[in-house]
């Protein structure tokens, strides 16, 4: 039997493995559209990243419940339009496979086409291959068949292709880096009243071809399993995971993997509004040749894994002793002029920006917990028009910043015009207070989906500014906490030195 999304056919035997309990979500970070594979005793997971760079985060685990961030497949997005923020564009729903000693990541950028990234070490540098210049393809997944053939399944974005809700299969070259035919439609959701069929993942198990894909849209959707004797179908269809009576809405896009001990699992996301798309782990059983996910087809709130616990966590705080931490992403392709690694400390140079929403040098990370405080210590060396601060990004966003002798709190709103037109952005002052000093500590507090801000000269003397405000989603993302130094007068300004970023999970 060929294991789904594994690096081999052998089962693993782990001596002394004890049952480990886990609770969903296993990750609070916005790891949207996850895919997962096993290679030997190691599990690897990737996710979407949209306009944030470096892109396609690569995570590693040995127990499926605890994950570490080990790198990114895309160091830059290879087009000049991503040298500035391109919200809702960029990296959509990648897939990951391991074949003949090589890791593969496939992704479609819906406006630019199909890419493959390859690496022998998933924590190292990845090589980018531009496979096909095409508009409107999304969510690609390869299948390296046991007879040497290579297939690709994908969906479509209606906003670009004029069609959606259907899945196509293409033949690929033996190395998986060339599409060699026009493809064939293998599933049309309209035939089964399935709307928004997307995110397909292709597998082969016991001679059968499988496509797992979500349908029904993101929040109220469900998981489909499609099964056929040929990659081209016809496919039988079954709903294998839905919300049921649980609080886990729309169990959406994800990946199927075996644990090497005879047990199958499904990792998927749940849309939690401003918190983004958090990661869940479901057991998979089998009945009449079909997968049954969760508990009788409904998501579980937690469970048991018979694997040794893996000590791992994703970093949040940073004193920049070793340079810029792995958790940070820019809002566009990074410019070397934006920052200097002081080791310790980080120098942010004031790049020109009309708004925080349009600032490529907004440096952010994913929220890793529901409630937390983020404290940042700045020493500013400002010129006219410079501001340095922290904020939480979304289509409605908030930030607190020091500039021109004042601490200011502002709200920004970005309104979509069209996919080719930059959003219309307005920023409105909420409150401000005089601050004649060059150094400041700023705090952002997140509680129950709301954010509030504080300022002062140290951790024990911080005062609130403004009230409590609801966080909102971004372009297919959750809200993102981050920091910045920018110039509002359209030119390069001075700089600020960031002494530390301390993120404390609320008890």
What are the residue ranges of the model-derived segments?
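Carbohydrate-active catalytic/glycan-binding domains of CAZyme proteins
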Residues: 2-507
């Amino acid at each position: 039997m060929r294991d789904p999304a594994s690096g081999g056919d052998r089962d693993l035997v782990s001596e002394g493995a004890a049952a480990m309990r886990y609770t969903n979500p296993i990750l609070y970070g916005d790891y949207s559209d996850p895919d997962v594979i096993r290679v030997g005793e190691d599990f690897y997971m990737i996710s979407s990243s949209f306009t944030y760079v470096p892109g396609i985060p690569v995570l590693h685990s040995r127990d499926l419940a605890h994950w570490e961030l080990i790198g990114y497949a895309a160091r830059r997005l290879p087009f000049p339009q991503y040298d500035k923020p391109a919200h809702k564009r960029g990296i959509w729903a990648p897939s990951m496979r391991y074949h003949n000693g090589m890791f593969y990541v496939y992704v479609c950028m819906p406006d630019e086409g199909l890419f493959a990234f390859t690496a022998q070490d998933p924590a190292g540098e990845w090589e980018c291959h531009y496979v096909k210049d095409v508009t409107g393809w999304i969510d690609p997944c390869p299948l390296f068949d046991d007879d040497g053939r290579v297939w690709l399944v994908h969906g479509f974005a209606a906003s670009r292709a004029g069609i959606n809700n259907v899945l196509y299969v293409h033949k690929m070259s033996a190395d998986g880096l060339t599409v060699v035919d026009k493809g064939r439609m293998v599933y049309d959701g309209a035939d089964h009243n399935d709307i928004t069929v997307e995110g397909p993942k292709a597998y082969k198990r016991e001679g059968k071809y499988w496509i797992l894909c979500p349908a029904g849209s993101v929040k109220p959707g469900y998981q489909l399993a499609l099964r056929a004797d040929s990659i081209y179908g016809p496919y039988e269809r079954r709903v294998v995971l839905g919300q049921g009576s649980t609080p886990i809405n729309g169990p959406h896009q994800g990946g199927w993997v075996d644990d090497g001990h005879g047990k199958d699992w499904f990792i998927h996301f749940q849309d939690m509004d401003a918190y983004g798309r958090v990661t869940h782990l479901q057991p998979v059983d089998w009945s009449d040749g079909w997968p049954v996910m969760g508990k009788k087809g409904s998501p579980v709130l937690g469970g048991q894994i018979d694997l040794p616990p893996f000590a791992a966590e994703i970093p949040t705080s940073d004193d920049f002793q070793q340079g810029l931490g792995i958790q940070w992403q820019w809002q566009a392709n990074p410019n070397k002029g934006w920052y200097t690694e002081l080791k310790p400390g980080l120098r942010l140079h004031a790049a020109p920006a009309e708004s925080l929403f349009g600032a490529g040098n907004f440096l952010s990370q994913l929220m890793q917990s529901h409630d937390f405080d983020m404290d940042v210590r700045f020493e500013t060396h400002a010129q006219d028009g410079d501001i340095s601060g922290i904020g939480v990004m979304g289509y409605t966003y908030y930030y607190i910043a020091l500039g021109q002798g004042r601490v200011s709190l502002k709200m920004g709103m970005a309104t979509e015009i069209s996919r080719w037109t930059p959003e219309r952005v307005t920023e409105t002052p909420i409150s401000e207070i005089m601050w004649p000093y060059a150094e400041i500590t700023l705090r952002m507090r997140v509680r129950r989906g709301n954010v509030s801000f504080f300022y002062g000269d140290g951790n024990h003397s911080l005062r609130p500014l403004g009230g409590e405000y609801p966080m909102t989603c971004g372009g297919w993302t959750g809200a993102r906490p981050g920091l910045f130094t920018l110039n509002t007068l359209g030119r390069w300004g001075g700089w600020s030195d960031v002494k530390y970023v301390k993120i404390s999970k609320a008890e």
